[in-house]
Amino acid sequence: MIKRDGCSQAAVEAALWDSPYEPLATNLKGVIDMQQTYGLERMGLINPQVVYRNMSPAWLTEQALLNQEGVLSDTGALVVRTGKYTGRAPDDKFIVDTPSIHDYIAWNNINRPISKEKFNALKSKMLAYFQNRPIYLFDGFAGADEQCRKKFRVVNELASECLFIRNLLIRPTAEELAQYGEPDFTILVAPGFQCNPQVDGTHSQAAILVDYESRTVLIAGTRYAGEIKKSVFSVMNYFLPNEGVLPMHCSANMDPVTKETAIFFGLSGTGKTTLSADPNRKLIGDDEHGWSSRGIFNFEGGCYAKCINLNPEKEPYIYNAIKAGTLVENVVLDEDTRHPNYF
């Protein structure tokens, strides 16, 4: 997943949410079971048009193109515009305040409370919104250390956002997927759902609500995929300290000979990814890690790097990764060649 901040945004066409195309009903292994719901009804999500679970990058890219969610670059990457939100929306994020978690949150103008009643009401609306729509489902893991990894289920309205989280999280093997069971945490992602601040208690038409008690995240009204990523980190940041693990916003790499690890701390855009992508060292991860008694491990299985001023000589790993199967946000393409303009 690649993104660029600060570019001008085109309006999202209405066709994005009401595509005239029918979902693809087959994959390379044969016909998809159009009746399988993978237990979504247990969380109240009923009557989906169809549920596509853990589809391949090629399939998700094809579906995103059919849905008019984006276009291809000259290297085959899927390029999308995220509309109004080209970054995270901190004013739109809330944590459900309940007695069981109240004393564990540093409440302030960033960690702001919302009631359980408001959360449940908005969740019911979003579940109704998903009815009679195709759902792009991803079941995966956060945490390379199997002793403290968490199972995340991400329910997506858009194929492109399913491609994002499929690339970012740790993907289960076929055997792990068959035995996946119930997730530890579920994230509902509906960019086309618009909140009503006066009724829903939100700051705007967008909202990111985290309920640690019911282990559910609601993301509405924003197509910026970084909200999914940071929601996963928020969950890991809340639960892992009680398991003796220090969550860290950092990149990390390792000397291939001595096995010594270097950690690079910094805010977004300060160079963590660039510093960790050293061709002479082994990359552990570029953004989110845990530090346990067993060592340092990556939460993720992919990379979400800024590509403004991206240079193939200075950052060859990132530059060469922008190809078929990857997702690029908010990068301008040459109209004739489809070559990205990173500058």
Give the predicted meaning of each segment.
Residues G271:
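Conserved glycine(s) of the Walker
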